[in-house]
Amino acid sequence: MNSETLFQRSKQVVPGGVHSPVRSFSSVGGTPIFFSEARGAYLKSVEGNDFIDYCLSFGPLLFGHRHPEIQEVVEDTVNKAWSFGACEPYSLELAEFITERIPWVEKIRFVNSGTEAVMSALRVARAATGRNKILKFDGCYHGHLDQLLVKSGSGLAGLSSSDSKGIGPEIIQNTLVLPLDDESKLEELFQREGSNIACLAIEPLPANYGLLPQRIEFLKKCRELTTKYGVLLLFDEVISGFRVSFQGMAGITGIIPDLVCYGKIIGGGFPVGAYAGKRELMDLVAPSGPVYQAGTLSANPIGMRAGLKTLTKAWTENPYPALESATKQLTDGILTLLSEKGDTNWEAVTFGSLFWLKGKTENPIRRIDQIPGTHKSNFATLFHKLLKQGVYLAPSGYEVGFLSTAHTNDIINLTLEKTKKALKD
């Protein structure tokens, strides 16, 4: 059994051979690796080869693959129940744990993905304001719901397209799009459309079209204008929530949203999303209010208990400073090795345990139109050199990398040894 054979078989029965576009390697070329096992910082391919993993399932695995403490909880849960479709104590425990530690999360509803979370939060925003228009930003990805799949990132970036076919103009006619980091255009739009906008949705740390940290002044302007015009501010913290700090970007910046969406880490490696916010907004959700949202597997016991164990460890152990330091150690080491080989055209953007290797630019990149045109092909070359040595990055130059607590000092040093070998090719 090998990846090439499996990929050809998969293409016969699965669109493009994959269940999420970026996995196809279409952005970097070549045949995607099929993996069969994972533990700690490592993936094992079906061929039996080990790879140091810096994709980490695109972010959920704060403590690495199959952390023993989390696995123990999962196995215990599997022996008790898989799904109830009824009330259970586990989601209550997780909800209480979060609301007691994040003041702006007064109530929370669990769903099965970040896409579901954002979709539901927008519904709440429209109901609460009586308005229909949604404002988003070019390059911010909020899942594959129709209204926000406009000028997005994630897999669409790798496909050289910012929109999806099959979304009618009548669906997105109420979607407004602006570039990031442009306060004047933001003010102009609010002066013109402010009374019609239900919600401003933003990744406070855009991380789906590269890593584009925003100026605090821009995020403050989003909060200022939404408050002034009665627009709800939605922070999409599916990636940044519990990843850059326990309280996410809202906690770091002190900018408090009306609604917030979570995913990835909140489920401890299982498919869980959540939307949350002020009590008066969340009380609009059925059955307490008129905004309908439901799900067969929402708050499934495996995801709830894995999530609670993960967040408990994150809260009590506070791995964030060490992860930030390890991320800098990794990226500084890679850049040094590239420079020693005479390639000084790279730099790294880091934020906490997220990193993005990119072409060097004169000024920090905050918008997607500032990304060098050569980035995609340059990254693809570096990706395959590292892959050949057993280092696995996300297979797109527009996806970010992640570290976990499983990425010890020894593993980072081994990664740098492998990088040195890769650059000799």
From Swiss-Prot:
Subcellular location: Cytoplasm
Pathway where this protein functions: Porphyrin-containing compound metabolism; protoporphyrin-IX biosynthesis; 5-aminolevulinate from L-glutamyl-tRNA(Glu): step 2/2
SUPFAM superfamilies for the chain: PLP-dependent transferases
Gene3D superfamilies to which the protein is assigned, alphabetical: Aspartate Aminotransferase, domain 1, Type I PLP-dependent aspartate aminotransferase-like (Major domain)
Transmembrane domains' residue ranges: none
Reactions it catalyzes: (S)-4-amino-5-oxopentanoate = 5-aminolevulinate
Top-level taxon: Bacteria
Pfam families: Aminotran_3
Record-linked InterPro entries: 4pyrrol_synth_GluAld_NH2Trfase, Aminotrans_3, Aminotrans_3_PPA_site, PyrdxlP-dep_Trfase, PyrdxlP-dep_Trfase_major, PyrdxlP-dep_Trfase_small
Chain segments annotated as coiled-coil in the UniProt record: none
List of residues that carry N6-(pyridoxal phosphate)lysine: 264
Cofactor requirement: pyridoxal 5'-phosphate
Keyword Heme applies: no
GO cellular component: cytoplasm
E.C. number(s) listed in UniProt: 5.4.3.8
Major localization class: cytoplasm
PANTHER family: GLUTAMATE-1-SEMIALDEHYDE 2,1-AMINOMUTASE, GLUTAMATE-1-SEMIALDEHYDE 2,1-AMINOMUTASE 1, CHLOROPLASTIC-RELATED
Family: Belongs to the class-III pyridoxal-phosphate-dependent aminotransferase family. HemL subfamily.
Protein name: Glutamate-1-semialdehyde 2,1-aminomutase
